[in-house]
Regions:
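Polar low-complexity intrinsically disordered regions
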Residues: 1-2, 195
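Generic detection of short hydrophobic beta-strand segments and adjacent strand-loop junctions
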Residues: 5-11, 36, 74-76, 142, ...
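Phosphoinositide-binding peripheral membrane targeting modules
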Residues: 14-54, 120-165
Length: 195
């Protein structure tokens, strides 16, 4: 995706709700009348949840919350009911991919630079160190070669490869979870190629 690309999505809330426009541009992200400068974006959390009436699944709600300058949040929500707008699952995935490619990779890269310069960084309660990962403040340091991770639909888990009971779980609908998982993936990949 080129830096000059502008991507727009038309989204609906509810069965007959009005359309809301989400625009990704080189210098800004805009949702309806709210515009955020790219430099101000600091984090994202997102999820898809089911709409249940009585015991029946009747639709899906797609939620994204983007944190930007001074801890302000932009909420983007759209949904589908009764099989209408089935394409929204693909739209949701496309929005997340576009957000990453155009904005969020830069946020993660800045955090990685801080980790390299300082030799430690705490994200979402997990401490990343040159020698490994500490899952909690009082926990032991798990060496990088023993750090494992598993990704699931709505969360991921970090664990000690030899002692799976030593682990931590993070929901994708939690602040800093995307940053943490991306840094773990990147560091593990870099260390695998160094061997």
């Amino acid at each position: 995706m080129s830096a000059a690309t502008t991507v727009t999505y038309d989204l609906r809330k509810g069965l007959w709700g009005e359309k809301h426009k989400l625009t990704f541009a080189q210098d800004f992200l805009q949702y309806d009348d709210t515009r955020i400068a790219v430099a101000g974006i600091t984090d994202i959390k997102h999820r898809m949840r089911w709409i249940v009436w009585y015991k029946f699944y009747v639709g899906r709600v797609y939620e994204m919350v983007i944190r930007h300058t001074e801890e302000e949040e932009l909420r983007i929500t759209f949904n589908s009911y009764f099989g209408l707008r089935k394409q929204y699952m693909d739209v949701y995935a496309g929005i997340i991919e576009t957000f990453w490619a155009m904005y969020f990779q830069k946020v993660v890269d800045r955090r990685q630079l801080v980790l390299r310069e300082r030799g430690e960084l705490t994200i979402s309660g997990v401490q990343l160190l040159d020698e490994g990962v500490r899952f909690s403040e009082q926990g032991e340091i798990v060496p990088w070669e023993k750090v494992g991770y598993a990704e699931y639909y709505s969360y991921f888990a970090l664990y000690h490869a030899d002692r799976a009971k030593l682990n931590v779980r993070r929901d994708f609908y939690a602040w800093e979870s995307e940053i943490l998982l991306s840094l773990i993936r990147t560091i593990k990949a870099e260390r695998a190629t160094d061997i």
